[in-house]
From Swiss-Prot:
The presence of a 'disulfide through disulfide knot' structurally defines this protein as a knottin. Its main location: secreted. This is Putative calcium channel toxin Tx758. Expressed by the venom gland. One of its GO terms (cellular component) is extracellular region. Belongs to the scorpion calcin-like family. Disulfide bonds join C29-C43, C36-C49, C42-C58. It comes from the Eukaryota. The keyword Secreted applies. It is found in: Secreted. The keyword GTP-binding does not apply. The lineage of its organism: Eukaryota, Metazoa, Ecdysozoa, Arthropoda, Chelicerata. Residues 1-18 form the signal peptide.
Amino acid sequence: MSTFVIVFLLLTAVLCHAEPALDETARGCNRLNKKCNSDGDCCRYGERCISTGVNYYCKPDFGP
């Protein structure tokens, strides 16, 4: 029984701390809400690379 509890707690700890790797140099994002570095890197025509406070994402550009 105690082995089950230890394995369960270990598995829970691993899953809770598992996060996708943050790639600050992400490229090739060709849809909305994907990380980008600059407009030329990954945003389609009519989109701009805009900061959301933490990361940058491709968003529609509605004007000059």
